[in-house]
């Protein structure tokens, strides 16, 4: 039995995205969102990778927000398995760096949007993703910087307001 959320989560775990390195996670997610019709904008700042992806033109905006970075592994010999090799235990638990915080949540958000848009190709509102590789570190060049930029744009256009935000942590 295949599970789209598990498969995407495993793909993200395999990427050694130790803060602030994204290790290509945003490229993986961005490619899937682009296939759905999202408009992608990279808003990188220094060594931090940020992605702002939007779908739809009118109506209230629901934003999915999260991060691709993980904290450093520490002493690798203290691990019972490679932290960047996803492993499903005999009890069905997924192990790997980012499995709980928060690569599985990102995968669930992406797959939920895929299913939603498959059944609702023209929703009555807008969808967005605000993703960063700067949450586990200083957390100043990620979400904070993107929200500040979006606020500036909103002051000029009024069209980028986030009405609702879902954070999967």
List each language-model region with its residue ranges.
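Acidic/His- and Gly-rich active-site-bordering loop/insert found
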Residues: 1-99, 117-124
């Amino acid at each position: 039995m295949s599970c789209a959320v598990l498969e995407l989560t495993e793909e993200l775990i395999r990427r050694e995205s130790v803060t602030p390195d994204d290790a290509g996670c945003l490229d993986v997610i961005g490619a899937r969102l682009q296939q759905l019709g999202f408009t992608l904008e990279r808003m990188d700042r220094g060594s931090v990778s940020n992605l702002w992806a939007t779908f739809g033109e009118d109506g209230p905006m629901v934003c999915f927000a999260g991060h691709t970075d993980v904290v450093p592994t520490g002493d690798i010999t203290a691990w019972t398995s490679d932290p960047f090799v996803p492993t499903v235990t005999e009890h069905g638990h997924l192990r790997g760096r980012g499995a709980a915080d928060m690569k599985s949540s990102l995968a669930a958000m992406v797959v939920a949007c895929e299913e939603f848009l498959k059944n609702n190709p023209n929703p009555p509102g807008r969808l967005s993703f605000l993703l960063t590789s700067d949450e586990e570190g200083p957390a100043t060049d990620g979400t904070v910087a993107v929200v500040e930029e979006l606020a500036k744009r909103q002051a000029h256009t009024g069209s980028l307001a986030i009405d609702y935000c879902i954070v999967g942590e």
